[in-house]
Amino acid sequence: KSLYKGARPVLWSVVEKTALADAEVEYEDHTSNTIYVKFKVTKSNIKELVDNDILIWTTTPWTIPGNRALAYGSDLEYILFQIQEVNDSSLAKIGDIIMIAKKLQDSVMNEIGITKIEVLKSFLGKELIDTECNHPFKDIGYDFTVKVLEADFVTLDQGSGIVHVAPGHGADDYNLGIKNNLDIVQPVTDDGKYNEHAKCFVGEHVYKVDLQISEKLKELDKLVYLGKLQHSYPHSWR
């Protein structure tokens, strides 16, 4: 017999600096910051996608420094479109070419404030095999490849139909990272502060950094939308 030493994701309280069992977690309504973020495509078998953007949505902006991949649904239909008109308050830019799930087109346009588009191409997720992107923080030291991977946990309930994957922050993300030999980075210390893996955000607390992350994304022309969502969120019973 052989021994195996590895790791697994656990729920963690940054206040008590301890792991939590499922039975110790209570769920309460919580208002989270939400963001839509652009990832620039550097390599793809879909030639129209190269040098354009894949759009992701997340309720945890603080996990962006931990991003190492994007995930798509193999049998989901995606579209590539060019933005032609936006409303006055939108952060989206006319002329940008963006990829999202076809079924979520209307909800994405309404939320972001896009009023007119031209669809350039439609395709199934399975055609995204071997696609790669830059990290949105590439210009501030995140100079590694972000792989675009197939995953069975991608749904069309909300967002863009593409999931941002941070292998150090959740079970689905971690398992996908292990399966695809991703760099499993945990950029957060036991007390909830960023470590050296988070580059310019070192020392910032993840509970307080969402707007700072969003502002940096906006500065780098990667932020398309900043909003809020009330949803059920885990809390320590202590």
Predicted features along the sequence, with ranges:
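Glycine-rich, acidic and aromatic/proline-enriched surface loops and short helix-turn segments
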Residues: 138
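C-terminal accessory/binding modules appended to enzymatic or scaffolding proteins
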Residues: 147-149
